[in-house]
Amino acid sequence: MKKSQYFIVFICFFVLFSVHPIAAAAADSDNSTVNEWFQKKDEKTADQSEQKKEKTTKTADETEGAAAPSVSAFDFVKMIFALLFVIVLIYGLVKLMNKRNRLLKPFQYVENIGGTSVGQNRSIQLIKVGKSVLVVGVGETIQLLKEIEDEKEIEVILSQHEEAMSSKIEWQKFVKPLKSSEHQPQQKLPSFSKALKEQLEELKQNRSEGKKKGPRHHE
């Protein structure tokens, strides 16, 4: 009887001492799993925060890159200067071509400097004949009104004519060739110059006849 009681007590002590380390181990394992779960959660939140930061930096870089192509005041000034340079270059080329065309033209002994209309089919023209400048009335007939003899006045008239010719920009040559308008003045110039020469010859004859009559009248 006593032996059975001792045996039962021994078994109880054995069970108690054997269960305690198992429970401690289980508790330790439970504590380790909880710690690992918290660590994993912290790492996950840290990764999510880093991803959010990277996204925000990317969006900021993209917005800065999109805002970069905006035109500044310096770019606007450069564009204006480039446009002015192109305009000046075109003007210089056109002026040079006009000057070259005038140099290639044959020398004209008789040249129309300019004129103005004074009525229907009537006008007053300035004609350059050699180094002389004549004021001619053109109507049904051609009459010599005046011969400009002042050298300073002649220089002023010719210089103004040259400036007007040099500053004149013939844009029509770059658009289309006006063949008809180029041929018509060439057809009219011979008849006009011929009539002018005849008028000048008649004027010379009248002057020479007047000089001859003068001495006879004195005799």
From Swiss-Prot:
Species in which this protein is naturally found: Bacillus subtilis (strain 168)
Signal peptide region: 1-26
Cell compartments where the protein resides: Cell membrane
Record keywords, A-Z: Bacterial flagellum biogenesis, Cell membrane, Membrane, Signal, Transmembrane, Transmembrane helix
Chain intervals with Basic and acidic residues compositional bias: 41-61, 200-212
InterPro entries, sorted: Flagellar_biosynth_FliO
TM regions (residue ranges): 71-96
Gene of this entry: fliZ
GO annotation, cellular component aspect: plasma membrane
Keyword Hydrolase annotated: no
Bilayer topology: Single-pass membrane protein
Region span, Disordered: 41-62, 200-219
Major place of residence: membrane
Entry function: May be a structural component of the flagellum that anchors the rod to the membrane.
Protein name, UniProt field: Flagellar biosynthetic protein FliZ
Domain of life: Bacteria
Any one biological process term the GO annotation gives: bacterial-type flagellum organization
